[in-house]
């Protein structure tokens, strides 16, 4: 068990950036943050990383450098390190950072399925194996004007009584009338209604981009090779046309719908600029003169900066850090200015503004010696890949 201080270092690392602030003039745009001494930032960052590496390896102090054998690493150890490094690089390329809009509060909207019996459904061949759900995309765009504003989308279905266990599958309709598999669910028998939910965030983002008038899903019974009966046994509310009057109205209100969580357009106007549509990652921040919240370069040379010779690979790495103001999206003529004034009165040294913090972090594989035995280990959350205001 490492000392309690070392165990807390990964949690305290974001706070160290706040301690780097030096007295100075507040920046513009209603930010209460102060000017920053970049050399102090880097020195503090290097010391934080020193403690973080030792903590992750459960070491109270660096290993004795005299025990490190000279010469190249064994081939097997080098191959293991290279494969670990390549895997991390591959995972990093596949990972997409969360949209910047995820910082803001979300508005929840419900978009009902086009009512069963509409002529749209006439195009689908009647089947005991499947049911179809179509949605008017103009209603989707009214709720979510731009794909970047969408945070989450679920298709929700009210399952009524089910006498037998059934395996169901959800599919997305393509414009060429083909179907793409999305997800599946094993439903247990029950006498009570139950809401089923499927995450379709990626699909709805596609719909908002493609501009088709009608889009849809298909819910089907799982087709097993050794099963002769592929009938969809589950009864989903909203697909019976025999009801009349008030009962039909109540029944229709609970028909399948899309539950959307999105940032209101007026709350995220700054996302409209191409600059803010970019992820605040190394690809953007390192090639621009961005002054607001962004990833800043910080290279750690293990020998030069930390005085360590016991880490054999890599010789150093780009730790990076987040820096830059997060301007308010409110103005002084709002009611919030009274709250802000009261907050500053009771917390004169604190910042009421959002802070620039890491959003995506990558691990760092290393090779080091314990005595005369080489070890390959992966240190989690060591490289800042992108930032956000939070």
UniProtKB/Swiss-Prot annotation:
Transmembrane segments: none annotated. The lineage of its organism: Eukaryota, Metazoa, Chordata, Craniata, Vertebrata. GO terms for biological process: ATP biosynthetic process; cell-cell junction organization; cellular response to transforming growth factor beta stimulus; chondrocyte differentiation; epithelial to mesenchymal transition; extracellular matrix assembly; extrinsic apoptotic signaling pathway; hematopoietic progenitor cell differentiation. GO terms for cellular component: blood microparticle; cell surface; cytoplasm; extracellular space; nucleus. Residues 1-29 form the signal peptide. Residues 226-252 are annotated as: Bowtie tail. SUPFAM superfamilies: Cystine-knot cytokines. This is Transforming growth factor beta-1 proprotein. Pfam families: TGF_beta (PF00019), TGFb_propeptide (PF00688). A motif (Cell attachment site) lies at residues 244-246. Homodimer; disulfide-linked. Interacts with the serine proteases, HTRA1 and HTRA3: the interaction with either inhibits TGFB1-mediated signaling and the HTRA protease activity is required for this inhibition. May interact with THSD4; this interaction may lead to sequestration by FBN1 microfibril assembly and attenuation of TGFB signaling. Interacts with CD109, DPT and ASPN. Interacts with EFEMP2. Interacts with TSKU; the interaction contributes to regulation of the hair cycle. Interacts with TGFBR3. GO terms for molecular function: cytokine activity; growth factor activity; type I transforming growth factor beta receptor binding; type II transforming growth factor beta receptor binding; type III transforming growth factor beta receptor binding. Transforming growth factor beta-1 proprotein: The precursor proprotein is cleaved in the Golgi apparatus by FURIN to form Transforming growth factor beta-1 (TGF-beta-1) and Latency-associated peptide (LAP) chains, which remain non-covalently linked, rendering TGF-beta-1 inactive. Belongs to the TGF-beta family. Glycans are attached at residues 82, 136, 176. Transforming growth factor beta-1 proprotein: Precursor of the Latency-associated peptide (LAP) and Transforming growth factor beta-1 (TGF-beta-1) chains, which constitute the regulatory and active subunit of TGF-beta-1, respectively. Disulfide bonds join 285-294, 293-356, 322-387, 326-389. Residues 75-271 are annotated as: Arm domain. SMART domains: TGFB (SM00204). Residues 30-74 are annotated as: Straightjacket domain. InterPro entries: Cystine-knot_cytokine (IPR029034), TGF-b_C (IPR001839), TGF-b_propeptide (IPR001111), TGF-beta (IPR016319), TGF-beta-rel (IPR015615), TGFb1 (IPR003939), TGFb_CS (IPR017948). Keywords: Cleavage on pair of basic residues, Disulfide bond, Extracellular matrix, Glycoprotein, Growth factor, Mitogen, Secreted, Signal.
């Amino acid at each position: 068990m490492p000392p309690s201080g070392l165990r807390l270092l990964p949690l305290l690392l974001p706070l160290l950036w706040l301690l780097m602030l030096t007295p100075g003039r507040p920046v513009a745009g209603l930010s209460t943050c102060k000017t920053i001494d970049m050399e102090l930032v880097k020195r503090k960052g290097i010391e934080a990383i020193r403690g973080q590496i030792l903590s992750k390896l459960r070491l109270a102090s660096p290993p004795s450098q005299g025990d490190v054998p000279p010469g190249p690493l064994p081939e097997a150890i080098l191959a293991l390190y290279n494969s670990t490094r390549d895997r991390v690089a591959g995972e990093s390329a596949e990972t997409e950072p969360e949209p910047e809009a995820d910082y803001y509060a979300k508005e929840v909207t419900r978009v009902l399925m086009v009512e069963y019996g509409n002529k749209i459904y006439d195009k689908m061949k009647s089947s005991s194996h499947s049911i179809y759900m179509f949605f008017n995309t103009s209603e989707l765009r009214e709720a979510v004007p731009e794909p970047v504003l969408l945070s989450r989308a679920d298709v929700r279905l009210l399952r009524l009584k089910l006498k037998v266990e059934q395996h169901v599958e959800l599919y997305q309709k393509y414009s060429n009338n083909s179907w793409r598999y999305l997800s599946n669910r094993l439903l247990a028998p029950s006498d009570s209604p139950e809401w089923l939910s499927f995450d379709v965030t990626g699909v709805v983002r596609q719909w908002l981009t493609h501009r088709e008038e009608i889009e849809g899903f298909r819910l089907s019974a799982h087709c097993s090779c050794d099963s002769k009966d592929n009938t969809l046994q589950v009864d989903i509310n909203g697909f019976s046309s025999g009801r009349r009057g008030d009962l039909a109205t109540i029944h229709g209100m609970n028909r399948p719908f899309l539950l959307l969580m999105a940032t209101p357009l007026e709350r995220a106007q700054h996302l409209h600029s191409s600059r803010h549509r970019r992820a605040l990652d190394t690809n953007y921040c390192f090639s621009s003169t961005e002054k607001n919240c962004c990833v800043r370069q910080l290279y750690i040379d293990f020998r030069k900066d930390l005085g360590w010779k016991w880490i054999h690979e890599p010789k150093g790495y780009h730790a990076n850090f987040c820096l830059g103001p997060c301007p308010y999206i409110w103005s002084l003529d709002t009611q919030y200015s009274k709250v802000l004034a009261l907050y500053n009165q009771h917390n004169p040294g604190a910042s009421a503004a959002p802070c620039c913090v890491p959003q995506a972090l990558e691990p760092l594989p290393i090779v080091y010696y314990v005595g005369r035995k080489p070890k390959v280990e992966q240190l989690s959350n060591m490289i800042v890949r992108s930032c956000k205001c939070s």
